[in-house]
């Protein structure tokens, strides 16, 4: 798994945990529906830091919490 796949999986996981749809996330985060859709559908494989920060804010987590998972730690080891 690469960073892009991790990001998509993490957004989907957090939406499921909060019982919100990607469309609801776009509204809460102040990000367009097309931006969320393009990230989740693979059209945008490199969401910017500002976009990711808005998504995290909408999910009521920090960016540290977004990346603080076992999957990310494994990914980090693979990259090194």
Regions found by a protein language model. Give the residues of each.
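Intrinsically disordered, low-complexity basic tails/linkers immediately adjacent to helix-turn-helix/homeobox/MYB/SANT
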Residues: 57-65
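Short, charged recognition helix plus adjacent turn
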Residues: 13, 38, 67-80
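Short alpha-helical DNA-recognition segment
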Residues: 19-38
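Residue-level detection of the helix-turn-helix DNA-binding "recognition helix"
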Residues: 16, 30, 41, 71
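Short, basic-rich loop-to-helix N-cap that marks the start of a DNA-contacting helix
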Residues: 43-54
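The alpha-helix within a helix-turn-helix
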Residues: 15, 26, 56
